[in-house]
Amino acid sequence: MIKLLLALFTIFTLVHAQPSSKALNSSLEAIGIEESYEEIRALDGIRDKYATSYKSHMKRYKATQEDHATIAKKFEEANVPLFFSLIPYCESNFRSDIRGHGTAGLWQFMAQSGRTYGLTIKKGNDERTDICRSTDAAILYIKDLKKEFGSWYLADFAYGMGEIKLKRLIKKNGSNKISVLLKDPAFPRGTKDHFGKTLLLDATIHQSKSEE
C-alpha cells in the first residue's frame, strides 16, 4: 500500500511540477544553446503559456514510458540528444496511428520524406506507423539536419519549419542565435510552440530524475 501511494505521489508530482530555470538551462545546453534561459526573452513565460498542453504531454509520457524508453535508447546509441526523442509527444501525442494532412505516425513524416529515409509506404504497409522503423528514419533525418545547420537546436527548428524557411530566416537576420530567430515575427508559431513544449517536457523529466 505504501509503495502504491509513493508511486502515485511520484506520478502526481511529475505531472504537476514545473521545471526550474536550472533544469531549462541544462536542456538548452544539451542541444547546443549557449545563451541561458534568462537571456532568451522570447522564452519568457513559457511555463505558464504552455501549462495546459504541458500537463497533457506529461500524462501521456507517464502512460507510454515503456515505448519511449525503446526509442530513447535508439537516440542514445546514435549520440543524438534525448530532447529529440520527446518530439512525438508534441507532434502526434505519441500515437503511431495518427494521421495529419499527408503525414502519419509518431514522427508525422510526409510520404516523400519517409521514403527518402528508407521507409516503405504503400497500401497495406506504411512504415511511418511502425515505431521502431520510423524512429530509425527520424534519427537519420535529424542527424542530416544537424550536419546541414551545425547545431542541434537549429536541427529542431528545421524539423519543424523545413530547411528552406530556416535558411531564409537566418539570412534575413544575419544570425543563427536562438534569441534573434525566436523574436522574428516571421518565425513560425507552430515551430515555436513545438520547441517550447518539447523543452518543458525535457527539462521536467531530467529534473525529476536528478531528484530521485
Question: For each predicted feature, which ranges?
Answer:
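Sec-dependent N-terminal signal peptides
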Residues: L4-T13
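An acidic, Gly/Ser/Thr/Pro-rich helix-cap/linker signature
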Residues: H16-N79
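Solvent-exposed, acidic/flexible segments
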Residues: H57-H68, E77-V80, R99-W107, E127-T135, ...
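Short, functionally critical alpha-helical segments immediately adjacent to catalytic or ligand/cofactor-binding
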Residues: V80-R95, A155-G160, T198
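Short, solvent-exposed loop/turn and secondary-structure capping segments
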Residues: D97-G102, R168-K172
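Catalytic and binding regions of secreted/periplasmic enzymes and modules that target cell-wall glycans
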Residues: I142-N173
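Low-complexity, Gly/Ser/Thr/Pro-rich intrinsically disordered linker/tail segments
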Residues: S210-E212
